[in-house]
């Protein structure tokens, strides 16, 4: 009897400390799946070895009036924001992407949806080559999307790169 009680206690205590089950992947017909697919399409278009990008596909992912906002911490820690249309981003990024490999991918994603609006917070890592062990940059992309007809379109991408004084908080890093 004591052995049985000890085994039950051991089983209960190890299951209490076991990792929680992973969340199920979104169903292909769900809004979350469509939203995450749109966000991943943005990452896929801008990522690749040095060379051309599919800018028509990139622009098709955005809603009319969409904006991309990059932030940079300057002297004294003051943040500046560079607001661009998708076309302005394309003009600024084309030369860099033609000459340099750039691979950016999300390592953690959080999606919130209400009716026809969505917010996606992705922690990203950037590499010059898909074979690079360590990223040259990490940060957070904040995507806002809107449902237009049957499609989810990007309305805003707002991002900030981490730095020594502003590391990515643990809650936005991949769960280990």
Give the positions of each predicted feature.
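Hydrophobic h-region of N-terminal signal peptides that target proteins for export
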Residues: 10-18
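Positively charged n-region of N-terminal signal peptides that target proteins for export
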Residues: 1-4
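Surface-exposed, charged secondary-structure patches
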Residues: 67-68, 80-131
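N-terminal, post-signal-peptide region of Sec/Tat-exported proteins
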Residues: 50-78
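Short beta-strand edge/turn micro-motifs at domain boundaries
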Residues: 19, 119, 138-167
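Hydrophobic pocket/interface hotspot
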Residues: 42, 58, 66, 120, ...
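Short, low-complexity N-terminal intrinsically disordered segments enriched in polar/charged residues
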Residues: 18-61, 173-176
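A short, polar/proline- and glycine-enriched secondary-structure boundary/capping micro-motif
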Residues: 79-82, 131-134, 164-171
